[in-house]
């Protein structure tokens, strides 16, 4: 643990930091109001991400016991290296492209030739009819979601999400003074609870966010589910005389198993915006590169496209990283070795089932969502630490009673963890 002094509003404040966190501000001082940060930021500081905190706990345990004796399933950080074409593309571009072009500004939407290459790839794969103007290159999917929410959301309008969900969605919606509305989980299948959705959509609903393949459950929404969802949204648009956007967050699209197909949502509902990231499909999470798709069929699409490009700029991104845009152009149809994740998926799923744990077999992404053997899943997570097993509580995804395990780890980590999971299961009367 390192420490440093920060000057905040004329005061010197001691801040502790690790490699993974830039600082932990004293909570007593924060509550007392002596640190002058925005009111909107105080809840984020007070409730720092459980996932990140668990990752830091993993660092502590690794330092104490050794990396091979710690089973850290907390963070969805890809463990499979990027395809060779990524390295080759970077070398080729740096050696052969004009530097002022390669590293320079471009249209806020991104290089036109890059966007056209991606559009044609999507058209080949999904039978769509996109062109360059339908795409906006973004600083990953997270930035893309902020861009589209900035573009469409007015203060106090509602955005609906299906629990369990990535909790940062709430932060993104509140960035633009919107209101997040949760739909309770369908814990039998973890397909969206469409009955409750239909009840909660109202005249103030601006958008619905979906994520498939799904974090944290690994479920892929079926075509039947997507068709039913689209029908509900169409009906509600007509009922309220307003546009309801469907925002599809797709960082895990390429990670699907057992031949499962992931429906491409613009084909089912015209007012769909797709947010994509190469963080998982090419193992490039730190490079922050992705895109938005805004189809021509979307209501007033040309205005939305123009506004989204401007939002990309005014939110501070200006444009997506220029070098990585060109890398993506050269690697547009490449993907990571999904077979490695599949091997991990089967080993961990089968191993946990043999220990007596309950969970749905994931169809995509790289997560298992396991039912806690006790009502308070945080108690279960704490018990896991005794065996150097790190899991994320389901309450971090607005779904208490479950824990998430990210199996984007080494195969040896999974194999070595299973005897410890067996001990953990025995502690709770399983097996």
Residue ranges, per PLM feature:
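PLP-dependent class I/II
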Residues: 5, 12, 23-54, 62-94, ...
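Short, basic, low-complexity termini and linkers enriched in Ser/Thr/Gly/Pro
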Residues: 8-9, 19
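Alpha-helical substrate-binding/gating segment
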Residues: 98
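Short beta-strand-loop-alpha-helix junction that forms the active-site gateway
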Residues: 57
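Pre-Walker A segment
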Residues: 101-102
């Amino acid at each position: 643990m390192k420490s440093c002094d920060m000057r905040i509003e004329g005061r010197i404040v001691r801040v502790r930091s690790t490699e993974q966190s830039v600082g932990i501000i004293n909570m007593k001082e924060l509550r007392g109001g002596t640190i002058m940060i925005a009111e909107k930021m105080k809840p984020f500081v007070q409730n720092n991400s459980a996932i990140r905190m668990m990752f830091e706990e993993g660092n502590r345990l690794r330092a104490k016991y050794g990396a091979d004796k710690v089973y850290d399933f907390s963070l969805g950080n890809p463990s499979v290296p990027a395809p060779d074409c990524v390295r080759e593309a970077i070398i080729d571009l740096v050696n052969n492209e004009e530097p002022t072009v390669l590293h320079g500004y471009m249209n806020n939407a991104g290089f036109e030739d890059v966007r056209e290459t991606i559009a044609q790839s999507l058209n080949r794969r999904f039978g769509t009819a996109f062109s360059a103007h339908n795409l906006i290159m973004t600083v990953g999917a997270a930035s893309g979601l902020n861009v589209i929410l900035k573009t469409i959301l007015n203060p106090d309008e509602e955005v609906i999400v299906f629990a369990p969900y990535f909790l940062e969605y709430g932060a993104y919606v509140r960035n633009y003074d919107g209101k997040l509305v949760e739909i309770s989980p369908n814990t039998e299948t973890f397909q969206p609870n469409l009955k409750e959705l239909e009840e909660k959509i109202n005249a103030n609903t601006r958008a619905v966010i979906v994520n498939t393949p799904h974090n944290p459950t690994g479920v892929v929404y079926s075509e039947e589910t997507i068709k039913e969802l689209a029908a509900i949204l169409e009906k509600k648009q007509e009922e309220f005389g307003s546009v309801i956007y469907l925002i599809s967050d797709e960082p895990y699209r390429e990670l699907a198993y057992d031949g499962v197909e992931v429906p491409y949502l613009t084909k089912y509902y015209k007012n769909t915006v797709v947010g994509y990231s190469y963080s998982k499909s090419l193992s490039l999470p730190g490079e922050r590169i992705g895109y938005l798709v805004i189809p021509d069929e979307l209501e007033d699409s040309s205005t939305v496209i123009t506004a989204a490009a401007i939002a990309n700029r005014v939110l501070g991104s200006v444009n997506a990283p220029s070098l990585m845009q060109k890398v993506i152009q050269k690697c547009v149809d490449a993907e990571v070795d999904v077979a490695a994740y599949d091997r991990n998926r089967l080993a961990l799923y089968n191993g946990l089932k043999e220990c007596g744990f309950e969970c749905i077999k994931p169809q995509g992404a790289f997560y298992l969502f396991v039912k806690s053997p006790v009502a308070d899943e945080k108690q279960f997570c704490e018990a896991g630490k005794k065996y150097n097993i790190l899991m994320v509580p389901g309450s971090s995804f607005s779904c208490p009673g479950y824990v998430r395990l990210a199996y984007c780890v080494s195969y040896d980590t999974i194999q070595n963890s299973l005897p410890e999971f067996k001990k953990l299961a025995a502690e709770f009367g399983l097996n």
